[in-house]
């Protein structure tokens, strides 16, 4: 079965923002969780970070440098984030991205209105920065420059690995990250813990 590009209003909204807001598309760029190969055409030199191997492979086949980890010393002029559904994970990614910006760089984030786009401006501004925004294609695009280091560190920690009160390790973005799901509870009662 041939690969069919997914329909993504998020990618269309990002491309619209670059057209109307005169964002600079040259220079070092990082795409975080890109969900549409249309972005490859606009940002052919962009580095890509995606945690899923199949997505990383698609971007690698298009000639993009795929990053395994996001290191603080990489430095990008622009970072574009296609937001995941989970709010704490999104905030952590935004904060982490701000830590990767070169001076004067910009983070541009986008989410579908049904998966958090309506509150995206508030989320970015919770890092203590002012943010521009626009709405297009039933999505919200928000952009800002770097937040303070303390705000970045706090949000990054909240989105990182955590130990819950019951002793289990968890992380925002994982299924049922903030509570014990029914299936795991059943397994705990029927399997030995060792």
Name the predicted role of every residue range.
Residues 135-194:
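SAM-dependent Rossmann-like transferase core, predominantly class I methyltransferases
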Residues 90-106:
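A short glycine-rich, Lys/Arg-flanked "PGG" loop and its adjoining helix->strand segment in the class I
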Residues 119-139:
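Conserved Class I S-adenosyl-L-methionine
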Residues 4-62, 181-194:
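Conserved SAM/SAH cofactor-binding pocket of Class I
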Residues 104-114:
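Conserved beta-strand signature within the Rossmann-like core of class I S-adenosyl-L-methionine
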Residues 38-42, 92-97, 123:
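A short acidic, amphipathic alpha-helical/loop segment
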């Amino acid at each position: 079965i041939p690969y069919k590009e997914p329909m993504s209003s998020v990618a269309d909204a990002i491309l619209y923002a670059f057209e109307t807001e005169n964002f600079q598309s040259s220079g070092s760029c990082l795409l975080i969780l890109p969900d549409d190969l249309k972005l490859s055409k606009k940002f052919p030199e962009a580095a890509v970070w995606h945690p899923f191997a199949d997505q990383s492979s698609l971007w690698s086949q298009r000639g993009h440098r795929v990053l395994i980890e996001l290191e603080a010393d990489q430095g990008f002029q622009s970072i574009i984030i296609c937001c995941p559904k989970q709010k704490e994970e999104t905030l952590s990614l935004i904060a982490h991205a701000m830590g990767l910006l070169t001076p004067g760089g910009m983070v541009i984030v986008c989410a579908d209105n049904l998966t958090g786009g309506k509150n995206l401006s508030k989320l970015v501004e919770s890092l203590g920065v002012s943010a521009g925004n626009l709405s297009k294609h039933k999505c919200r695009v928000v952009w800002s420059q770097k937040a303070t280091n303390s705000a970045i560190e706090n949000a990054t920690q909240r989105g990182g690995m955590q130990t819950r009160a019951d002793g289990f390790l968890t992380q925002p973005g994982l299924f049922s990250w903030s509570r014990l799901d029914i299936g795991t509870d059943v397994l705990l009662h029927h399997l030995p813990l060792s």
